[in-house]
Amino acid sequence: MSYYYETEEVNNNPELKSNFPWLADRIHEGRSSIFHALGYVGLKTENAFGWFLSTERKTISTAKNEVFSSDERKLPGVAYVVVGGMAGNIFARNRIAPARWLITSLSTAATFMFCFPKTSKNIGAFVEKRFPAIRKQRMLVLEQTQKNIQNAQKSMTSAVEGVQKHYENAVKKIKGD
């Protein structure tokens, strides 16, 4: 248990108790209940803080072991990422708020991916390993994007062939064949 649950020794003034016995008892009960309530709150706070610290340590340990690459130089990379984020903010300074936030975030993310390529790949692998739903969604988007690119290539090929046929027909008409 905690030291908050120790009994409290209160020396009541005998004169006060003889004049107002109910008041002295109420004061003693109030002090004891407040003392115990604060002890309970303190104990719960200690437990919550301990849980928070253990979760933080576990998260940092996982990040060090699985995400961060040890052979990338951190200080210059972080400086470049910060400058990239500020540059994105400068580029978007006269835009509306959502566009400003989006451009700044994209600029920061792109700079991070450029300055920390191994860590970026590790983050992607970590997210896909820990969150299979995100991996599934990413694969679905990738398949749809590839299908759209193939459809666009087919459309462009047929459009180019159509333009070439019209060009050849126009040349034949001009030559009089």
Swiss-Prot record:
GO terms for biological process: cristae formation. One of its GO terms (cellular component) is mitochondrial crista junction. Pfam families: ApoO (PF09769). This is Uncharacterized protein C1442.05c.
